[in-house]
């Protein structure tokens, strides 16, 4: 059901994101890692994530769709054949991409990023691509069998082990080699690969435990229709490629920062300072800005099939209220998060990253993106459900072009000369890109479907946020002279949530 799937995915996303934030807080505050370690690891992770997108992003949905179609007509044998062919095909693709990343690590780190220390992290991450490719197929297979919990549990397990292994490896490295940031970043990368292997092992064992049930279903299979390997692969690609174009472009968009920020900052600062500035943005700021999206991410996974079903039956009335609810939820969460991070950027950073508290200006600028990113998530999911996948793609291309242009223009400018120079310029470029992407998608959505959100509903949310902001500022300033700033911001944020909900 819609509500059940929303809850499962919401809880999973929340757990994964919270553990991820804990992991980032630990790394950033760890002596020897800090902002420089974030720069090294994050630059490597962005190109790794792009390879993952190519190998796996559209695969779960494609496999899920084909498997569910076969099972709907009783063809369990055909459904399992899709799974087997997908494992072999995309396992081979993942293995190839692992080899490419491994062999190109030196060139990418030295020439693309201009962060030579990232080479070891890229090498450590490369084996993970193979395992993630197969894991994506297994998740898709069980999703097609309407078993969402298998994939959700595997994501939680992967994130828990990543954090635990990261802490263990970083502590071992720091005690054996000292605070060598390059080695510590590589240790974090190794932890990522190990956690993906553990996730793969969990899903493999899960599949083995279900193999008897699957075998019995195959014996009683109905309406089996032979399809060749080439035909099956082409069917998967026909579904996965349109779904992957957007995420691939988004991955390229992320790598714009990796390839332009350090290069641009070197115009007016040293290599070391440039890495620290870049690490500050991609390590701390991006983590905080993206975190609220986990409250909203569950909607994107459930809106696509729901809207697609409504389109197929040409009956949108049942889903109108759910679409409106998803967009209002994005506003209800996004607007106060934006305002809260803008008002309390400095105390939030001091609370979470006491050893590396810099970056308040960056957080204030970047926080503007939150509401637009959350709205874009849901709008793009609705458009995909309507079969209008080209529209989010167009928005991404335009947004990416704007981000690249602004990065190239603003990042090389010293922020002492112009406020929106340096990393402030990169943050502003990201905000501009996200606004443009939402506007393009939103304009087209209004042409295809009636959203039904009234202006007075938006005004209510804005007024509630303003009231929350005024009360929270008063509470924070009143208690600041009595208790510590860290305790004060915790108290203020608790009151903020309570006031807003009331």
Language-model regions: role of each:
Residues 106-125, 324, 341-373, 420:
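Interfacial segments at transmembrane-helix termini and the short loops linking adjacent helices
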Residues 3-6, 42, 77-92, 233, ...:
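Interfacial transmembrane-helix starts/ends
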């Amino acid at each position: 059901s819609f509500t059940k799937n929303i809850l499962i995915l919401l809880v999973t996303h929340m757990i994964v994101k919270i553990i991820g934030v804990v992991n980032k807080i630990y790394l950033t505050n760890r002596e020897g890692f800090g902002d420089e370690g974030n720069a090294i690891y994050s630059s490597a992770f962005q190109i790794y994530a792009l390879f993952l997108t190519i190998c796996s992003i559209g695969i779960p949905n494609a496999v899920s769709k084909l498997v569910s179609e076969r099972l709907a007509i009783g063809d369990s044998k055909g459904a399992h054949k899709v799974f087997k062919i997908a494992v072999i095909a995309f396992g081979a693709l993942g293995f190839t991409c692992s080899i490419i990343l491994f062999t190109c690590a030196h060139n990418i780190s030295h020439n693309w990023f201009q962060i030579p220390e990232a080479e070891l992290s890229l090498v450590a991450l490369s084996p993970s691509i193979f395992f993630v490719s197969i894991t994506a197929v297994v998740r898709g297979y069980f999703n097609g069998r309407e078993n969402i919990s298998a994939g959700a549990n595997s994501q939680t397990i992967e994130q828990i082990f990543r954090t635990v292994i990261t802490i263990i490896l970083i502590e071992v490295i720091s005690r054996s080699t000292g605070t060598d940031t390059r080695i510590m970043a590589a240790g974090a990368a190794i932890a990522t690969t190990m956690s993906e292997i553990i996730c793969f092992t969990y899903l493999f064992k899960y599949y083995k435990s279900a193999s008897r049930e699957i075998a019995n279903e195959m014996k009683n299979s109905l309406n089996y229709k032979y399809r060749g390997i080439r035909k099956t692969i082409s069917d998967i690609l026909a579904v996965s490629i349109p779904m992957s174009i957007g995420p691939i472009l988004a991955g390229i968009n992320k790598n714009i920062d990796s390839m332009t920020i350090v290069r641009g900052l070197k115009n007016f600062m040293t290599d070391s300072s440039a890495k620290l500035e870049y690490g500050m943005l991609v390590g701390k700021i991006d983590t905080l800005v993206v975190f609220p999206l986990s409250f909203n991410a569950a909607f994107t996974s459930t809106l696509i099939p729901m809207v697609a079903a409504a389109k197929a039956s040409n009956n949108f009335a049942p889903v109108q209220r759910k679409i409106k609810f998803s967009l209002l939820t994005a506003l209800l969460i996004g607007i106060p998060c934006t305002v809260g991070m803008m008002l309390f950027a400095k105390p939030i950073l001091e609370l979470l990253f006491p050893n590396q508290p810099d970056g308040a200006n960056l957080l204030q600028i970047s926080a503007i993106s939150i509401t637009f990113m959350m709205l874009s998530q849901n709008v793009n999911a609705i458009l995909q459900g309507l079969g209008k996948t080209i529209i989010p793609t167009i928005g991404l291309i335009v947004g990416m072009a704007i981000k690249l242009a602004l990065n190239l223009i603003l990042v090389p400018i010293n922020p002492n000369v112009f406020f929106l120079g340096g990393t402030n310029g990169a943050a502003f470029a990201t905000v501009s890109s996200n606004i443009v992407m939402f506007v393009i998608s939103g304009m087209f959505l209004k042409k295809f479907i009636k959203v039904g959100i009234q202006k007075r509903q938006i005004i209510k949310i804005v007024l509630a946020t303003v009231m929350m902001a005024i009360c929270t500022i008063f509470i924070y300033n009143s208690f600041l002279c009595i208790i510590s700033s860290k305790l004060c911001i915790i108290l203020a944020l608790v009151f903020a949530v309570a006031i807003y909900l009331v």
